[in-house]
């Protein structure tokens, strides 16, 4: 549960043990409240002075501690009471697929995992702009760009493991799906090797969702009954070009702008039709989303101004999107014409 209320300057009493109440304390502090603590119904020396009349009392569910008398006193005094969930088991890692970056494409599992985190290590392709609205955890940017890794993969794994071993609930938020060119397998292995409990929450992969944002289906009846997802981080070999060219279906390339010239030339050498349509979808589901369409013979020139993050789609399905777009534009033009005739 995240707070959308402004509690600036308000006194809020949060009950429960230090471990149980830690996330609730952060939430109310971020909402601007003056947070006071009551660890047990009788109080502990470390709790400090309590407010004479708090604006709100937050009761943290920590295994049946007897807070009922306090709740009843608050109700009698007209003091609002909020019931807060305790954090989950301490010291674990959750790998979360954040989808292509749009908040509404986060899974229910992702949204449920974020509030339970003490620290979130997030990538640049995850929906990071809205994170503060989804969790009160500490947010650590470990995002990588092609050719620029501010934090190395091994350092990311080390940070995750160290935080979990300190008893923190760690969320590793990644763009797309952790297991589709997301190095999720390596991060799971690092946790397992360190004895840290770990689970994976799948995400909406950009290999399907970003083409969809541009109206391109990766499969379409009687056009393509298969699709292949390829990493564009490194140039492919001639053998791989030949394999791809002979598969048929749709080819989806993630983060492939840097290697697009080699890929297009290699596929042509391998016998792919130079008139095969190619789409470059930049910044899918983000401000400035743009689609560039050309054929395999001219895509290097057409995509000169394109940049990552981008998804390449190679195949006849690109024509499906163009046909639908042309039909929609023609229908809109007919509607405008009909409206003008009625007004005449």
Put a short name on every predicted segment.
Residues 63, 205-209, 310:
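Short alpha-helices
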């Amino acid at each position: 549960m995240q707070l959308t209320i402004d509690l600036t300057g308000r006194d809020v009493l949060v009950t429960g043990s230090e471990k149980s109440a830690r996330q609730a304390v952060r939430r109310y502090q971020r909402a601007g409240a003056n947070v006071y603590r009551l660890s047990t119904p009788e109080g502990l020396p470390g709790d400090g002075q309590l407010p004479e009349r708090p604006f709100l009392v937050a009761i943290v569910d920590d295994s049946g501690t007897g807070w009922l008398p306090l709740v009843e006193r608050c109700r009698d005094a007209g003091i609002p009471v909020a019931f807060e969930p305790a954090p989950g088991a301490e010291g674990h890692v959750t790998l979360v697929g954040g989808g292509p970056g749009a908040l509404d494409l986060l899974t229910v599992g992702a949204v449920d995992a974020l509030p339970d985190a003490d620290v979130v290590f997030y990538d640049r392709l995850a929906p990071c702009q809205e994170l503060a609205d989804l969790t009160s955890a500490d947010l650590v940017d470990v995002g990588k760009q092609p050719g620029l890794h501010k934090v190395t993969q091994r350092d990311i794994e080390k940070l995750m493991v160290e935080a979990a071993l300190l008893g923190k609930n760690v969320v590793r938020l990644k763009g797309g799906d952790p297991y589709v060119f997301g190095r999720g397998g390596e991060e799971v292995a690092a946790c397992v090797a360190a004895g840290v409990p770990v689970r994976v929450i799948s995400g909406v992969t950009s290999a399907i969702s970003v083409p969809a944002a541009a109206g391109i289906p990766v499969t379409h009846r009687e056009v393509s009954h298969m699709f292949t997802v390829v990493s564009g981080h490194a140039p492919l070999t001639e053998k791989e070009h030949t394999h791809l060219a002979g598969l048929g279906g749709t080819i989806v390339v993630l983060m492939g702008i840097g290697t697009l010239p080699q890929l297009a030339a290699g596929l042509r050498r391998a016998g792919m039709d130079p008139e095969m349509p190619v789409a470059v979808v930049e910044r899918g589901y983000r401000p400035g989303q743009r689609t560039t369409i050309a054929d395999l013979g001219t895509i290097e020139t057409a995509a000169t101004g394109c940049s990552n993050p981008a998804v390449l789609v190679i195949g006849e399905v690109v024509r499906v999107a163009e046909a639908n777009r042309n039909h929609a534009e023609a229908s809109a033009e007919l509607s405008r014409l009909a409206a003008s005739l009625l007004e005449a």
